[in-house]
């Protein structure tokens, strides 16, 4: 972590401007600490709660981890679990605090397990272990790279969970607090420490944040009863690979009075009913205070956030209700010394920077070494792929892999003398994990879709690949175009940040038949000129998408129609 390079400074806070009035009673914390360190909603605030809050009140979710409940639950047959509401809610809701998501609708009795992987950094040993877990489940087992630089593994059965958790601990991993109303995986620069142009190495900060959030994988019940999920990122590059504008808290590197630290953005999020870009908190913290300010913001959100309508419980709704200055004041009084400094005049991100493509071969800051970005088609991997990736990381690098928010993988620290041998490896030659994908495939992102997810309305991963490949037969695309797919309005595929986005829905076709369809979004941008996409067309049947997308690429993105053979349809 960069040291303090400036003079010693007294912490000074500027009083908030007058005019924003919030009733005193509204600022009373709505939660209180109970035995075991758990934070519970006060009795007088329990009217009008959403169903998820009622489940949390009925039984503390973290008890499944901190009090050994998972070991007992894993011994109970699913049929017996379903016979009682309490244990059924354990399986369908509370296990999400352990990163376990029951796929009741599509894979009854099987779970998706989401990990914590700060900055997307993983090792060959960890990758092999995860591969061994999904391999045991045969056709039901696979892994996905997520849009938060993370692993999700599929096919897990409940009786296996205690042993899997032990295996994760043995290789330095955890799945704790990775679902529901918790802090999600801390995102950082996927090229941290190897990027010749990085502003700061984000890994120390994301590791600190993750250690705080999970209490070093022991469980941190002080922040496990948030009103809703909460996303955080640390910016380390001019490219803004970390997507600060859609995070609840984004640390923007900035120098104030000669001292390195971060300006703060807050409130960015995507949801079914609303999506909003993060706004300046008008606050700066020194590099040493990354965790204290995160803690203060989380506690303000935990204490004051609404727990009624689930669609209005993300942190930005609280900021809107209180006003930014009052929200800032609530954060400030939860800081260790009761002071939160005003922002530096500007951050260190170059607003004229053209975002770089990390796929392919690129020189590192370390002489004689390169990193190789590999495209993972819609983020889906099988056990054999992961075993091979682990081997490549050991044989050509330093046993390390980096996951990206675009669902791809970076292999760092490859000696330049070994690049040709790496690029000749069958896994890369077969186009399975290509360093040189086509213009449309390289920017393709897709959520899980209805193959596994009960909330998804349409199938996404196979369809995303099919549409991209069919469109490429019709038009030549001169530059990468980021196309994102999400199976439902929850937008796990982040369609609002895409050049072209597809959000799953249902509609009637020309024959009056209900068919899978998509709302099309256009105009999302990432980088310093970030902008969330707007709806372009609603309820387009999926079978009609290819010509529409091809025309859109010609009209908006400089694509050129290809010549067709006479016998081509």
UniProtKB/Swiss-Prot annotation:
Its EC number is 1.7.7.1. Keywords: 4Fe-4S, Chloroplast, Electron transport, Heme, Iron, Iron-sulfur, Metal-binding, Nitrate assimilation, Oxidoreductase, Plastid, Transit peptide, Transport. Induction: By nitrate. Residues 1-28 are annotated as: Disordered. The keyword Plastid applies. It is found in: Plastid, Chloroplast. Siroheme binds at residue 492. Signal peptide: none annotated. Its cofactor is siroheme; [4Fe-4S] cluster. GO terms for biological process: nitrate assimilation. [4Fe-4S] cluster binds at residues 447, 453, 488, 492. GO terms for molecular function: 4 iron, 4 sulfur cluster binding; ferredoxin-nitrite reductase activity; heme binding; metal ion binding. Residues 1-4 form a transit peptide. GO terms for cellular component: chloroplast. Transmembrane segments: none annotated. It is an enzyme of class 1 (oxidoreductase). The keyword Metal-binding applies. Binds 1 siroheme per subunit. Binds 1 [4Fe-4S] cluster per subunit. It catalyses: 6 oxidized [2Fe-2S]-[ferredoxin] + NH4(+) + 2 H2O = nitrite + 6 reduced [2Fe-2S]-[ferredoxin] + 8 H(+). InterPro entries: NIR_SIR_4Fe-4S, NiRdtase/SiRdtase_haem-b_fer, Nit/Sulf_reduc_fer-like_dom_sf, NO2/SO3_Rdtase_4Fe4S_dom, NO2/SO3_Rdtase_4Fe4S_sf, NO2/SO3_Rdtase_FeS/sirohaem_BS. It comes from the Eukaryota. Pathway: Nitrogen metabolism; nitrate reduction (assimilation). Belongs to the nitrite and sulfite reductase 4Fe-4S domain family. Monomer. This is Ferredoxin--nitrite reductase, chloroplastic. It comes from Zea mays. The gene is NIR.
